[in-house]
């Protein structure tokens, strides 16, 4: 048995095949991890509702899940870690968008809720991808301090609009807020220090384990910092070269049972 006592894994392009199905071989490996008392924790930009069915399919029960890239970590329905955005800065952002970028679709995520002010073509498309339905509500109503914390915003429009907006926001004064592109037309907005790397540090601390005893698995550039930081960072075979360079090892692709193979070879072996 290796010295790995905790596994943190990305979802899309990692444990899901190109057909968006959970890898069957990985499902078969899960009981062996449970028997060895090695938690398997999912970390993704997805919302809780986008992650829980996958966790359920893997039989993860109440293992923590790091949602919104670690802005919210849930154990069952219990919040164990959260990093909400600064509502004063979000108010400023909404004012700026309504004045200069009125066409941008603004989507707010608070806990399990997805909130938008109208079902435009972008939110309809996002709903068809995630299988979720938004709550239609005035966005200003979500910003008041009496309302629940906001964990993420997603801004969607044509690529040239979003990329122009991204550059503008980076030059503005938002000290508590981070902006990054997750697709060429998706701009994610979170609290400043939210990242999968930070989630790795917090989840390892939650389990009281040193980083040397943690294995991380991922396929994309937002996974690279957690691959570099963990005791054993595994890049998927389908990852870009730049991601593979940050990892200790490269496994097979997401369509060739890469995660199951990595666990079998480096954890259960």
Q: Where do the PLM segments sit?
A:
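Mg2+-dependent phosphoryl-transfer enzymes with acidic/Ser/Thr/Gly-rich catalytic loops
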Residues: 2-6, 23, 188-269
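Asp-based phosphoryl-transfer active-site loop
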Residues: 3-18
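Active-site phosphate-binding/coordination module
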Residues: 21-123
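Hydrophobic packing residues within well-ordered alpha-helices of enzyme cores
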Residues: 26, 51-55, 165, 169, ...
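Alpha-helical scaffold elements within enzyme catalytic domains, especially in hydrolases
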Residues: 32, 96-98, 168-171, 242
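Short active-site oxyanion
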Residues: 37-41, 61-63, 151-152, 212-213, ...
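Short, structured coil segments at secondary-structure junctions
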Residues: 58-61, 69, 172-175, 229-230, ...
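Conserved acidic, metal-coordinating active-site core of Asp-based
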Residues: 103-217, 238
